[in-house]
Amino acid sequence: MLQMGKIFLGLAFWNVVLFVATIWLGIAHRSAHWQHQAMGVLTGIYTLLTHSIVLMHFMGSGKGIKDAVETHGLPADYARRTRRFKARTSGLATLSCLLIIAVVWLGGAKDVGMLKGMTHAWLAYFVVAFNLYSFWVEYRVIKENTEMIREIDARIANKS
């Protein structure tokens, strides 16, 4: 149990690999154009999955912590802290998802000639940087949440 930190590191690692591969295929022009498009869509979907897992983790652990506080008479501070954890990650994860959708959509617009210049590329670089920042914040908050869950588990074990 409590493996979310490791799971998230694995998800984020492969997300970074996909970001690098997608950007490389877009810059290098050594591949067929469809490879960059396919990799971009795959990377977009995988990024949405990664952030969705983080959102689901905080929904689930928040409910579990709230139930533990009520059932075992633990301090209400635990429930307050879990709400704060959720608040620190939800906005970033949601905005990261919206931005990745926008950059994939703009890639499609560029492909059909609705978008000229480097708009898609520059937005993609920004979105990758923003996602890396989001991953860093999400990992830190997941670690804090895991520490709090361990603390709650220890308190419950000591009461028994």
Where are the predicted features?
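Inner-leaflet juxtamembrane helices
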Residues: 52-71, 135-153
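Hydrophobic alpha-helical membrane-embedded segments
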Residues: 16-20, 34-61, 129-138
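Alpha-helical transmembrane segments of integral membrane proteins, especially early/N-terminal helices
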Residues: 1-26, 96, 153-159
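Membrane-interfacial helix-loop-helix connectors in multipass membrane proteins
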Residues: 28-35, 109-121
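Short membrane-interface loop/juxtamembrane segments of multi-pass integral membrane proteins
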Residues: 66-92, 152-160
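Alpha-helical transmembrane segments and their immediate juxtamembrane interface regions
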Residues: 2-5, 113-158
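Alpha-helical transmembrane segments and their membrane-interface junctions
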Residues: 18-25, 92-116
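Loop-to-transmembrane boundary segments
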Residues: 2-10, 78-102
